[in-house]
Swiss-Prot record:
(2R,3E)-phycocyanobilin 2 binds at residue 153. The gene is cpcB. It comes from Thermosynechococcus vestitus (strain NIES-2133 / IAM M-273 / BP-1). GO terms for cellular component: phycobilisome; plasma membrane-derived thylakoid membrane. Belongs to the phycobiliprotein family. The lineage of its organism: Bacteria, Bacillati, Cyanobacteriota, Cyanophyceae, Acaryochloridales. PANTHER family: C-PHYCOCYANIN BETA SUBUNIT (PTHR34011:SF7), PHYCOBILISOME 32.1 KDA LINKER POLYPEPTIDE, PHYCOCYANIN-ASSOCIATED, ROD 2-RELATED (PTHR34011). The keyword Membrane applies. This is C-phycocyanin beta subunit.
Length: 172
């Protein structure tokens, strides 16, 4: 796992060069935007159980076959596993937001997840829908202007959306 800083340094080191002005400017901007990033992660983390529960509730309302006998979320044990997986994905998305890089999400959460779901007979498309629902809720919470560092957060919200989209694509 590399954060944005370690990744840029590793790339420059591999080339045997100093950081370019563009790389330095990008890292400087990341530092300037750090409070917004921390605010977003704090808000998502503080509301994680609500985000997961509401996304699951909406998913099961749209796809009730998942919670009916024979469905992948039928029985308390399977439902708990579903909620746990959603929470884990959300947690790793927050790690990626904090790091400003998707490698922690990819390396520790998404790699091999589609194959695991296929082996278990879990419909990846349903998991992808749940992730999209978590994305919508997380962005709404993180982008609420009340009590957050002032300034334009559109680039950060786009970045956050990208992490959720990456997770959804990995399981679909």
């Amino acid at each position: 796992m590399l954060d944005a800083f370690a990744k840029v340094v590793a790339q420059a080191d591999a080339r045997g060069e100093f950081l370019t002005n563009a790389q330095f400017d990008a890292l400087s901007n990341l530092v300037k935007e750090g409070n917004k990033r921390l605010d977003a992660v704090n808000r998502i983390t503080s509301n994680a159980s609500t985000i997961v529960a509401n996304a699951a509730r909406a998913l099961f309302a749209e796809q009730p076959q998942l919670i009916q006998p024979g469905g992948n979320a039928y029985t308390n044990r399977r439902m708990a596993a579903c909620l746990r997986d959603m929470e884990i994905i959300l947690r790793y998305v927050t790690y990626a937001i904090l790091a400003g890089d998707s490698s922690v999400l990819d390396d520790r959460c998404l790699n091999g997840l589609r194959e695991t779901y296929q082996a278990l007979g879990t419909p990846g498309s349903s998991v992808a829908v749940a992730i999209q629902k978590m994305k919508d809720a997380a962005i709404a919470i993180a982008n609420d202007p009340n009590g957050i560092t002032p300034g334009d957060c559109s680039a950060l919200m786009s970045e956050i959306a990208g992490y959720f989209d990456r997770a959804a694509a990995a399981v679909a």
